[in-house]
Each structure stands twice: as structure tokens, then as C-alpha cells.
A protein has these predicted regions:
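Structural alpha/beta core scaffold segments of enzyme domains
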Residues: 1-202
């Protein structure tokens, strides 16, 4: 459309490009500029980003500010999780980029724990940086890092052993399939056994 050419007349030849890890899922403005230049000059145009240009143009991930609160009983049973998140979406929209960041963060927040209630406030902010998009598990590590740090903090405040606190709240095998407050479904898993084994080997 940008070039005034019918889509059926455009041929894309894609050779082996190696692993993508998400950053190659995006149509970047530079692609359009190269196509426009080729059309204007009437000859093939090739653009290969230098390493420093790659960091200035290719989508990235994980520029997120998270604040959370974990509510639990005196016995250490999780009651609720509240999270306020501000996500840097970059300077422009990259297709599914912002959606992927916010969706993955949302779905991963309960982790593998029984959390009856969850409140989440998400704010996406456009800035002057490179765009956020699918890149090496975008949104997932941010959510789990926050959750696990909250659990460690709760263990310190309550005096309950940090592994024991997790074992009390992890989704048991007999509860499978388990649907989280955010709609994610765990169909199977033996998380308590894995934690017990980790403790034994530590």
C-alpha cells in the first residue's frame, strides 16, 4: 500500500535467517525506507544494520516498572495479589508488540500458586525509545521476578521458611487442571515435588 503496488505483485524471498527470538516478528520502518529507495532509484537496495544500529532500531523488551502487594493469612495462605505496572512501549507501535508485553505479564502474574484474587492495573507509555515487542519471553520474567520477590518478602515478614511458604501455596497435582484468576490454565504439573527435590539438592 505504501508503495502503490498490488500485494499480489510483490514477491518476498526469505532465506535462512537463523533464530529470531521475537525481534524478527516485527515490520520495521527501515524496511519501508529500503523499499521506497529501491523504487525511487529503480535498482535493488540492500540495508544491513551495524551492531550499534541494531540496538537503536530493533525491538526490545522488559522496560517495565512493577509494584506489588501480596495478601496472606497468619498461616501463610495467599489471599490476593495486587500489581501496578507501567510499561514502556517505545516510540511507535509494532503490530502485536504492546499487546504481547501486556498479555504475557497479565497471564504470568499468578505463577504456579493458588491465588484466589488478583488486581492488576496496567499503564502503557509511548516514549522516545525503541519499540517493545516479542523478545525472549517478553512479560514473563518481569511477572515471575516480582511474584517471587514478594513471596520472599512475605516469608521474611511472617517468619515462615521461604520454601515452606511456597509449598503451602503451590497448585497441587490433584487441583489440575487449574484456572488462574487471569484465565490461564495449568493442565498438569508436580510443582511441590520439584520444590522438595530442589530443597533436598540445595
Amino acid at each position: 500500500i505504501s508503495l502503490g503496488i498490488e500485494p499480489a505483485r510483490i514477491r518476498v524471498i526469505s532465506r535462512d535467517v537463523g533464530g529470531g527470538f521475537g525481534s524478527r516478528n516485527v515490520i520495521y520502518p527501515e524496511y519501508v525506507a529500503v523499499l521506497w529507495a529501491a523504487r525511487k532509484l529503480g535498482r535493488p537496495v540492500k540495508w544491513t544494520a551495524r551492531r550499534d544500529e541494531e540496538f537503536q532500531t530493533t525491538s526490545q523488551a522488559r522496560d517495565t516498572l512493577l509494584r506489588g502487594q501480596l495478601g496472606l493469612t497468619r498461616d501463610g495462605d495467599f489471599l490476593a495479589l495486587r500489581v501496578d505496572s507501567t510499561c514502556n512501549l517505545g516510540a511507535y507501535h509494532t503490530g502485536n508488540g504492546p499487546f504481547t508485553q501486556l498479555r504475557n505479564l497479565t497471564r504470568m502474574l499468578p505463577g504456579v500458586y493458588k491465588t484466589p484474587a488478583l488486581y492488576l492495573e496496567l499503564i502503557g507509555v509511548f516514549t522516545h525509545t525503541v519499540p517493545i515487542s516479542s523478545y525472549r519471553g517478553v512479560g514473563r520474567m518481569e511477572a515471575i521476578t516480582l511474584l517471587e520477590r514478594l513471596i520472599d518478602k512475605a516469608a521474611a515478614v511472617t517468619g515462615i521458611d521461604r520454601i515452606e511458604l511456597r509449598l503451602r501455596n503451590v497448585i497441587p497435582p490433584e487441583a489440575m487442571p487449574h484456572t488462574t484468576p487471569m484465565g490461564g490454565v495449568y493442565d498438569s504439573g508436580t510443582y511441590s515435588a520439584n520444590m522438595a527435590l530442589t530443597r533436598e539438592k540445595a
